């Protein structure tokens, strides 16, 4: 008997993009998995499953993917542990779960996507002074339905998860920028734990796999990630240029013809601050480090032009300051203050701007610093609620990190205190 011809409407429905999410807690990993899989019953086969688990489940991490893969179907699996997790429950409302055992799962059907999962040993990386090809070879060819040579005119996106105990993460980030210029790279450093294995998940078989180093997925073809990076600070004072610096120590700043030590420059700024702001300077002062040495920006330039870094020391003899970043002469810098109100204002502005540029994403991923959450916002679900103001009904998943991987000024950095958003959108949208 001849086979039945394909039913066009059924084929179209099967290949339509979709996103399903689940968020559940439980004393045991079995309880959490059972709740998640009940919520995702009938979801169908996904192209990519993202799994984020609280560090409370660290000792059971080797069993997590096998338990999920017995009940859920996906071509690729990726995830990690976190100090907390972000997810969207059966009520359709996203939540941030800190310091409690919780499991978040996001299933994605991405027709036309080229997906290339990868695992990288960060202790054995190519030479940054060598050619780019060894760095590109760290990400193997994909096996997706749309497998082709990647379009050189359309950079891919890279989702990157790092293990907190693995060396060489900063070098890897630089190497990926070297190998894939123009590609958006987003993710975070997983949560720490005392179990004797890694914090990362990568598994395309029923066995699953716990990894250290770095795992991730290259996303190309019909889909891409768009980044929104909220560093949680607001600038105080003018933009300065670095006149003298040694490694990570800033010795002298200039503004026009005037030259001062960093401490003298800060003292001149303090005069114009309120008593509350001067008190904040005592414990919440940072330095924004510009990502271009060309053309001094105006004082009201967007904050995303600067990478916010910790001030780690002051030399009272000469007024120099040490920064948690290598500084070069000619670089632009600006002092910054961090507080909950500033963080919310900045995040709201950036998310609303993103909403005005793109249609509703299929899903959002949040990689948030452990220093955010309730401690920063003084309320539950601080970051995800801001996102829902800009993107109503958006499914969100993610994790609280020990460092966030995200671009600023076209360069990928390892951040702290940051909310790094990855929005999954179809290619061809503005």
Mark where each language-model region is:
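Small-residue-enriched flexible segments
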Residues: 2-62, 67-69, 75, 80-157, ...
């Amino acid at each position: 008997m001849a086979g039945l011809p394909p039913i066009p409407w059924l084929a179209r429905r099967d290949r339509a993009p979709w996103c399903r999410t689940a968020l559940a807690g439980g004393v045991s990993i079995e309880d959490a998995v059972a709740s998640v899989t009940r919520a995702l019953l009938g979801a169908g086969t996904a192209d990519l499953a993202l799994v984020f688990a609280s560090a409370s489940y660290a000792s059971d991490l080797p069993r997590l993917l096998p338990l999920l893969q017995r009940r859920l179907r996906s071509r690729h699996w990726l995830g990690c542990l976190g100090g907390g997790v972000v997810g969207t429950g059966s009520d359709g409302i996203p939540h941030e779960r800190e310091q409690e055992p919780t499991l978040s799962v996001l299933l994605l059907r991405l027709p036309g996507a080229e997906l290339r999962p990868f695992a990288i040993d960060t202790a054995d990386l190519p030479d940054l002074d060598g050619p780019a090809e060894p760095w590109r070879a760290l990400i193997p060819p994909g096996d997706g339905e749309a497998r082709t040579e990647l379009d050189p005119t359309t950079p891919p996106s890279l989702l990157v998860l790092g293990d907190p105990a693995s060396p060489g993460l900063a070098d890897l980030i630089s190497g990926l920028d070297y190998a894939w210029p123009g590609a958006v790279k987003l993710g975070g450093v997983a949560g720490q734990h005392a179990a004797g294995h890694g914090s990362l998940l990568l598994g395309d078989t029923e066995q699953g796999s716990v990894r250290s180093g770095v795992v991730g997925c290259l996303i190309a073809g019909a889909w891409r990630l768009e980044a929104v990076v909220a560093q949680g600070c607001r600038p105080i004072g003018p933009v300065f240029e670095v006149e003298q610096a040694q490694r990570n120590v800033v010795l002298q700043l200039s503004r026009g013809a005037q030259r001062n030590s960093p401490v003298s420059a800060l003292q001149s700024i303090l005069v114009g601050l309120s008593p509350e702001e001067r008190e904040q300077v005592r414990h919440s002062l940072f330095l924004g480090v510009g990502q271009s040495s060309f053309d001094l920006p105006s004082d009201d330039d967007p904050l995303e032009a600067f990478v916010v870094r910790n001030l780690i020391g002051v030399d009272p003899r000469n007024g120099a300051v040490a920064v948690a970043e290598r500084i070069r002469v000619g670089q632009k810098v600006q002092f910054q203050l961090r507080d909950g109100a500033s963080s919310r204002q900045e995040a709201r502005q950036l998310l609303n701007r993103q909403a005005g540029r793109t249609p509703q994403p299929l899903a959002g991923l949040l990689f948030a610093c452990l220093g955010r959450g309730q401690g920063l916002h003084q309320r539950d679900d601080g970051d995800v609620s801001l996102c829902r103001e800009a993107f109503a009904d958006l499914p969100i998943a993610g994790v609280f990190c020990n460092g966030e991987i995200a671009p600023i000024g076209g360069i990928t950095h390892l951040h702290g205190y940051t909310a790094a958003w990855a929005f999954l959108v179809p290619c061809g949208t503005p």
